[in-house]
């Protein structure tokens, strides 16, 4: 298993550490689906041609974007990506199968989100408008600047999302 190998190698390295691999999107997307179902009783659909998931209920369509991370490295967004709600999956404790899911009920067109400072000089909106990929760390950039717009909706072991138990 690559995660175990990375962890073991990092114990022996004193100057440079090996960064964790990107968290697999198909896993983060399913974690979010089941976290939404656990919280709201609504199961998003993964079969969508835009974004990562969608909720279709009573003629209302909610486009969902999902970002998973295992380190403080930046999450990257396509400059033309569109969503109605954004979810971050904190997979830093993936070795123990513990995850956190954060919900942000802001679209990428919302001024609060567009005004997130990703650098000293540029906001999310300015970078996206210039057709470049906005990038930022959830813990260092998004969570602190979003404040009450960023809600923890799940914090626990993956087995807690199994609605068949």
Predicted feature locations:
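Nucleic-acid endonuclease domains
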Residues: 1-59, 66-165
């Amino acid at each position: 298993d690559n995660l175990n190998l990375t962890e073991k190698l990092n114990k022996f390295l004193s100057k440079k550490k090996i960064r964790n691999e990107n968290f697999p999107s198909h896993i983060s997307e399913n974690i979010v689906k089941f976290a939404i179902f656990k919280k709201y009783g609504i199961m998003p659909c993964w079969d969508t041609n835009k974004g990562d998931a969608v909720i279709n209920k009573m003629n209302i369509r909610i486009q969902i974007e999902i970002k998973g991370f295992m380190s403080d490295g930046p999450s990257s967004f396509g400059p033309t990506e569109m969503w109605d709600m954004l979810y971050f999956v904190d997979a830093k404790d993936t070795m123990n199968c513990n995850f956190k899911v954060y919900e942000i009920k802001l679209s990428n067109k919302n001024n609060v989100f567009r005004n997130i400072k990703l650098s000293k000089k540029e906001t999310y909106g300015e970078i996206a408008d210039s057709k470049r990929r906005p990038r930022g760390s959830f813990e260092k950039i998004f969570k602190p600047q979003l404040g009450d717009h960023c809600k923890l909706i799940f914090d626990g072991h993956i087995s807690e999302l199994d609605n068949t138990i």
